[in-house]
């Protein structure tokens, strides 16, 4: 069964990084929406469906962990991948995985594909169990 292009929300206050991420994802077969603030991202999560969310750890006035927890209360389905400048010591159930800024695009793509694949597999198993 063919799936449509996965839809990703990338949240980062660094516009250049966010635009570069969108370009890499677009070339790699993803549709990517951009948000630059927590407020903008939460509004987009409420109104749109995403297969995964990329989330910068540091956002103006808040942290990615806080935003991830709010996202999970609004829409618990999409896996959240935290993008951080250093190895993450703090853990949260709201985070599927994380990548370190500076890791190559192949790591980002591998983590995104794995997270989306796991989510789709779980949804298929839930659908089969409901028969």
Task: Give the label of every model feature segment.
Residues 1-7, 106-131:
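Non-catalytic signal-transmission and effector/linker regions of two-component phosphorelay proteins
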Residues 56:
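Active-site residues of response regulator receiver
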Residues 60:
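The feature encodes the CheY-like receiver
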